[in-house]
Every structure is written in C-alpha cells, then in structure tokens.
C-alpha cells in the first residue's frame, strides 16, 4: 500500500501550548478602565469585520506586544459581567437583540390598548413578567450590570408596582374596577329605595302593591264611612253624621281625600260662605291623617288643595280652630302662613282651650 505523502499542514510546527492561567497576572484595571480585555475570539471577529485589511508592518508587532504585555492579557470574566466599557461579547449579542425586540413589542401593545379604550383614557395592558414572579429572573435575561437599554414605560410600571406585575394588571384597571363597583353600589341603593317593602312611615308593604299617594275630591256617599272613621279617631269630640253631611253635601268641592291604593289615609272638610255680609270667609272644619302615614306631607298637601279651591271661589280669608296643646297642628298651619288671631277658653267639650288661626288672602 502506497504511503500518502504528508500534506502542507503537517509541515507547520505544532502550536505552542497556551500558558496556564495561574501564571499570567490578572488585569489590574477595573471593568470601566480605558483598556478593554478582549478574548482571542473577539480579536478574530474584529479581523473579519474589518475586511482582513490589517497593516503588515504594525499588525503583527501590535499582536506580539499585546500578547507580551502583562496587563493586556486577562482571564475571561464570569457570565454576569460580559459587558465592559459598552462592548458586548458575541455570546450576548443575540440576547441583546431579543431584549430590544421584546421591549418594542410591549410598547406597541401598550399603544394599541390605549387607543382601543372607548373613553380615550389610558388602559393598562399585561405588564412585562406577568407570568413570572417578581423574585424570579426570566430566562435569557441580562444582569443589572450588563443591562444598558432604557426600560420601556410598561417595564418601569411593573418594576415600581410589584403587585401590578404579579397580577398582570396596572393601576388604571384597578381604578376602573373601583368606579364600576361604585356605580353598582349607587344603582343597588337606588333600586333598594324604590323597591323597598316598607312604606315611608315604616309599615310593611305587600310586594306589587301601589304605595303612591293620590289626592282626590269627594265623589259619592260611599266615601263617607272612611271620612268618619279618620276624623272620629283623631278629633277631640265626636260629630254626628248630619254634621258631616252638612259640610260635604253643601261644599263637596272643598272636601279632599288622600288615597293610598284603595285605602283612605287622610281627609279635609271645609266650607265657604259670606261673613257678616261683607267678605267671603273660608273655614276648615275637619282635618285628619292616619297615624301610620303622618310626617309625609299629607296634611300640608290637603290644606293647600283646600285653600286653592277656596281661592277659585273668590275667598277673602281662611279661619280655623285647633287645640292649644296640639303643637304639630299649630306648626303645620303656621308654616302655611296662618297667624294666631284669638284664644278661645274651654272651647272643646273636654275643657281644652282653642286657638283661632287666620290666613288673609287679600
């Protein structure tokens, strides 16, 4: 078998073994010094990037000088300090590009979410690291010493608010949720007030029952029992049915009832005639409101309706008598403009004094 002649590579002398790292002195300059420590691979990359145009006169001597200088030969630093003086090693270039691309994608997503908000306000999107806990470092990430790019606004928000980064929500979403909760509470309170099962006086109300207070004029004799029931229960002295018929049959337009559903809860009975043949005087004979519906303005509204009806009848003044001890009735009439005209001693059958109140219309 013929012997293969040795190739040209076999004629070259074997490469000298590299000197042990322990013998070489460590670089005395810090990471931010003016002289940069580069590996042989980086020098080869720079030669290729420069197009191979290396000076034949000074290139080799510079390499020899660099190799022979004790401070320019430094051991390879650890992985977390690959970037020195703004230079990035080839092993970290793809990581730098990935981080830059990720920040651009997050910025575009934030702008799209803000423009998609219907009310024009800023709307937060999922922040960086939504699926990674705040204490963990995502894969292929640079250390704090090797990171030179300016963080995006979304990353800054996530870094400043760990709870937002942990939940994937920013402060804007929390504010919107609080506003929605406030609107729900206001709506529920309004619905509760409208759909309450209690009347304004505190009485239980059946579901579906109409609790609106209606004011109607006297219409027929069928309403007489309700009027008598209210007035007999509240007034200080009883009246016969003839007294009711005298007022109601002669001045039915001056008799008003307050109705809640089909129940009569208030009534007022008045008259209007000539006084001393000089002027027309109106007289409020009876006013009563069911005790369960008091303090709802029913008595005031009944008196107002009666006075308006008297004004239509060309009334000059309105008078009435009430017990001097009935503070609520005195307050009601005085709030409507009545004044105390005269005190009538032992006016009622129970011996209580009365006050005559008067309202001048002209």
From Swiss-Prot:
Residues 214-362 form the N-acetyltransferase domain. It is an enzyme of class 2 (transferase). CDD domains: NAT_SF. It is found in: Cytoplasm; Nucleus. It catalyses: N-terminal L-methionyl-L-leucyl-[protein] + acetyl-CoA = N-terminal N(alpha)-acetyl-L-methionyl-L-leucyl-[protein] + CoA + H(+); N-terminal L-methionyl-L-isoleucyl-[protein] + acetyl-CoA = N-terminal N(alpha)-acetyl-L-methionyl-L-isoleucyl-[protein] + CoA + H(+); N-terminal L-methionyl-L-phenylalanyl-[protein] + acetyl-CoA = N-terminal N(alpha)-acetyl-L-methionyl-L-phenylalanyl-[protein] + CoA + H(+); N-terminal L-methionyl-L-tryptophyl-[protein] + acetyl-CoA = N-terminal N(alpha)-acetyl-L-methionyl-L-tryptophyl-[protein] + CoA + H(+). The modification N6-acetyllysine is found at residue 233. PROSITE patterns: GNAT. InterPro entries: Acyl_CoA_acyltransferase (IPR016181), GNAT_dom (IPR000182), NAA30-like (IPR044542). The keyword Acetylation applies. GO terms for biological process: protein stabilization. Pfam families: Acetyltransf_1 (PF00583). Residues 1-20 have a biased composition (Pro residues). It comes from the Eukaryota. Its EC number is 2.3.1.256. Residues 1-26, 38-88, 113-182 are annotated as: Disordered. Residues 149-165 have a biased composition (Low complexity). The modification Phosphoserine is found at residues 39, 55, 152, 190, 196, 199. Belongs to the acetyltransferase family. MAK3 subfamily. This is N-alpha-acetyltransferase 30. It comes from Homo sapiens.
């Amino acid at each position: 078998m013929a012997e293969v002649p040795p190739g040209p590579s076999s004629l070259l002398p074997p490469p000298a073994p590299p000197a042990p790292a322990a013998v070489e002195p460590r670089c005395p300059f810090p990471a931010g010094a003016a002289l940069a420590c580069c590996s042989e691979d980086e020098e080869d990359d720079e030669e290729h990037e420069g197009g191979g145009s290396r000076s034949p006169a000074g290139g080799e001597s510079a390499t020899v000088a660099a190799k022979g200088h004790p401070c320019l030969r430094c051991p390879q630093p650890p992985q977390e300090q690959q970037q020195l003086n703004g230079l990035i090693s080839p092993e970290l270039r793809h990581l730098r590009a990935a981080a830059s691309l990720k920040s651009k994608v997050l910025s575009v997503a934030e702008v799209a979410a803000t423009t998609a908000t219907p009310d024009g306000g800023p709307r937060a999107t999922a922040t960086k690291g939504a699926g990674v806990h705040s204490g963990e470092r995502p894969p292929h990430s640079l250390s704090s010493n090797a990171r030179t790019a300016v963080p995006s606004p979304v990353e800054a928000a996530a870094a400043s608010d760990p709870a937002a980064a942990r939940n994937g929500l920013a402060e804007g979403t929390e504010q919107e949720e609080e506003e929605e909760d406030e609107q729900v509470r206001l709506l529920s309170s309004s619905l509760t007030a409208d759909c309450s099962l209690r009347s304004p006086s505190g009485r239980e109300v059946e579901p579906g029952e109409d609790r609106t207070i209606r004011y109607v004029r006297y219409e027929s004799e069928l309403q007489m029992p309700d009027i008598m029931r209210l007035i007999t229960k509240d007034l200080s002295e009883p009246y016969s049915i003839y007294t009711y018929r005298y007022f109601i049959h002669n001045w039915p337009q001056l008799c008003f009832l307050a109705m809640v559903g089909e129940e009569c809860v208030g009534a007022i009975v008045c008259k209007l005639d000539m006084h001393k043949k000089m002027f027309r005087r109106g007289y409020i004979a009876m006013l009563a409101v069911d005790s369960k519906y008091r303090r709802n303005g029913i008595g005031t509204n009944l008196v107002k309706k009666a006075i308006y009806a008297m004004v239509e009848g060309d009334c000059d003044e309105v008078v009435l008598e009430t017990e001097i001890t009935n503070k609520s009735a005195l307050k009601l009439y005085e709030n409507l403009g009545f004044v105390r005209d005269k005190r009538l001693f032992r006016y009622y059958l129970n011996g209580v004094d009365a006050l005559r109140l008067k309202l001048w219309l002209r």
